[in-house]
């Protein structure tokens, strides 16, 4: 039986830190579904369609990876629906862990068969957060070390649209 996991996030934008966690997940699971979720509590720079397109572009050469969009509903229900037994979460620092730990307990209550797997990215990505990358890029800073070239191009386009 193939081991399947989901890797959810808003991915606004999809960073090299996200990619690092995905690569680590692929060392454990045969199939990983990157789930792009809408989060009404966050102000997105990119539309969900743009985030889906960038994520598909970044991950297109990774066997075992698919990209899906979750417009609404509970992540635990989605995991059950697709037959995933694990939810992958990247944890960069203690603050991330505190939030993710609470979410993992809730998801386990909703879907007892699911396990949350916490993966730490390479140390060079521990300070890379989408919110920081967006801010630096929109102010004209160089974020090329932190995102795939297609994401960088999309960020340049967004900056031009806003100026």
From Swiss-Prot:
Tree of life domain: Bacteria
Residues annotated to bind substrate: 10, 42, 75, 89
Site, Transition state stabilizer: residue positions: 18
Record-level GO cellular component terms: cytoplasm
Catalytic activity: (R)-4'-phosphopantetheine + ATP + H(+) = 3'-dephospho-CoA + diphosphate
GO terms classed as biological process: coenzyme A biosynthetic process
Key words of the record: ATP-binding, Coenzyme A biosynthesis, Cytoplasm, Magnesium, Nucleotide-binding, Nucleotidyltransferase, Transferase
Pathways involved: Cofactor biosynthesis; coenzyme A biosynthesis; CoA from (R)-pantothenate: step 4/5
Binding annotation for ATP: 10-11, 18, 90-92, 100, 125-131
Names of required cofactors: Mg(2+)
GO molecular function list: ATP binding; pantetheine-phosphate adenylyltransferase activity
Assembly information from the UniProt record: Homohexamer.
Job of this protein: Reversibly transfers an adenylyl group from ATP to 4'-phosphopantetheine, yielding dephospho-CoA (dPCoA) and pyrophosphate.
NCBIfam families in UniProt: coaD_prev_kdtB, cyt_tran_rel
Family as reported in the entry's similarity comment: Belongs to the bacterial CoaD family.
Classification via HAMAP family: PPAT_bact (MF_00151)
Protein name (Swiss-Prot/TrEMBL): Phosphopantetheine adenylyltransferase
Originating organism: Pelodictyon phaeoclathratiforme (strain DSM 5477 / BU-1)
């Amino acid at each position: 039986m193939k081991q399947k996991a989901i890797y959810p996030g808003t991915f606004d934008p999809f960073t090299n830190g996200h990619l690092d966690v995905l690569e680590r997940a692929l060392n454990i699971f045969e199939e990983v579904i990157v789930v792009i979720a809408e989060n009404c509590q966050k102000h997105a720079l990119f539309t969900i369609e743009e985030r889906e397109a960038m994520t598909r572009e970044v991950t297109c050469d990774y066997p075992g990876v698919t990209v899906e969009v979750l417009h609404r509903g509970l992540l635990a229900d989605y995991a059950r629906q697709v037959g995933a037994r694990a939810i992958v979460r990247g944890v960069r620092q203690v603050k991330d862990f505190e939030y993710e730990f609470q979410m993992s307990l809730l998801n386990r209550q909703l879907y007892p068969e699911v396990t949350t797997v916490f993966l730490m990215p390479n140390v060079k990505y521990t300070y890379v957060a989408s919110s920081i990358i967006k801010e630096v890029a929109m102010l004209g800073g160089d974020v090329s070390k932190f995102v795939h070239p297609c994401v960088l191009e999309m960020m340049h386009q967004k900056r031009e649209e806003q100026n």
